[in-house]
Amino acid sequence: MKTGIITMLFVLYLPVTAFATTLRLSNDIDLLVLDGKKVSSSLLRGADSIELDNGPHQLVFRVEKTIRLSSHEERLYISPPLVISFNTQLISQVNFHLPHLETEREAAHFSTTPRLELLDGDAMPIPVKLDILAITSTAKIIDYETETERYNKADKRASLPQFATMMADDSTLLSGISELDAVPPQSQALTEQRLKYWFKQADPQTRNNFLQWAEKQPPS
């Protein structure tokens, strides 16, 4: 589990900058896509935060919260997928701040008119652009990465076009399979492809820092 989280962090955020921003995770937030790339919820489970570089970022997520019904029963409310874009320049910490979501009425209002804040380490609001990610696919399993790419290319309210093209997609990563070692099971293979891809993109100092850090980690 620890290895999975470590690998994911390295894959998503290289190259590492001297100034980083800590995104504090919330139990009420299901993070789906970060900066145009799919995030595995299983890898995030148990993590308190993730590190981002300073600059523009985009999250796609759902709010998942237990609410009370008029019958005094409880049920899990899951919001539509939301897109939020923001800039972490000169910001060291980002925290989610949700509105009051306890009743069925409040949940219904949030689904149609979502409002939430991102706060910095001093509890001051960070400028954001928030939107609902309208899903066009009719598939049972939604490819949120593809839907986010489509959204970013459509010049919507929270679109960041740079995340529609700057990240290599999985087909690109897997196209170089002949250069790699024997392929393990598919999910492992994809993680390994991403790790090798981003390692090659990093500058020599970042590569050296990562290798030194990795050597100190206990085996999984």
Curated annotation (Swiss-Prot):
Protein's UniProt keywords contain Signal: yes
Coiled coil: none
UniProt KW Signal keyword: yes
Keywords from the named record: Signal
Pfam families (UniProt xref): DUF2057 (PF09829)
Protein family: Belongs to the UPF0319 family.
Identification of the protein by name: UPF0319 protein CKO_02102
